[in-house]
A protein has these predicted regions:
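Conserved catalytic cores of phosphodiester-cleaving nucleases, focusing on short active-site segments
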Residues: 77-97
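Acidic-basic catalytic patches of nuclease active cores, encompassing PD-(D/E)XK
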Residues: 1-2, 8-66
Length: 186
């Protein structure tokens, strides 16, 4: 568009084609909602514990949190129960196409998943390689095996292909990751 003073108006696209689908967290929330509605499993996203320091009260309805901080480091993103077993997992996305950087998952989260496994629960991570449009489930025992036997700072995609489990996308549930637990014999 040309304005009277000759300056061209540039329009910037607000749409990104780098992630055309929904993000991983939304896909998992939709899947978990499907599992809940159909009485398959009860799995919830854990709230992140915060302490509120400052609130702007324009009115009771329009209160806005202006300043807050995390109370404690969060453990993992999701937990629940499936077929009488406690499950706990973390979800992560990466734009990398060759590996998953280990700095994307915190040490305390890995320690938490190790404890879940030690006590008979099912722990895993779900990793989406966004540019490849591939989502993998990697059980904590396979993650521990990798960490104990490698000095790398990232997990190569080849490790996910060999030891992880691809999660196929569908309509309902969007990501049927519980099918992988069934295949493992949970």
């Amino acid at each position: 568009m040309r304005y009277p003073n000759g300056i061209k108006k540039e329009y910037k696209s607000i749409h990104s084609h780098s992630n055309r689908g929904m993000n991983l967290e939304q896909d998992l929330n939709d899947s978990n909602n499907y599992y809940l509605i159909n009485d398959i499993a009860i799995i919830y996203k854990k709230p992140t514990p915060i302490t509120i320091n400052k609130v702007d009260y324009k009115s009771r309805v329009d209160a806005v949190i202006k300043e807050a901080h995390f109370k404690t480091p969060s453990t993992t993103d999701y937990n629940g129960i499936y077929k009488g077993k406690y499950i706990d997992f973390e979800d992560k996305e990466t734009k990398n196409t060759t590996s998953f950087p280990l700095n994307n998952i915190h040490k305390h989260q890995i320690e938490h998943l190790k404890k879940i496994y030690k006590h008979g629960g099912i722990g895993f991570i779900i990793v989406r390689f966004t540019k490849l449009n591939k989502t993998y489930l990697l059980f904590i025992e396979d993650l521990i095996n990798f960490l104990n036997n490698n000095e790398r700072v990232s997990i190569p995609i080849s490790y996910f292909k060999e030891f992880g489990h691809i999660i196929k996308e569908g309509l309902n549930p969007r990501l049927d990751y519980l099918k992988i637990l069934d295949q493992k014999g949970v």
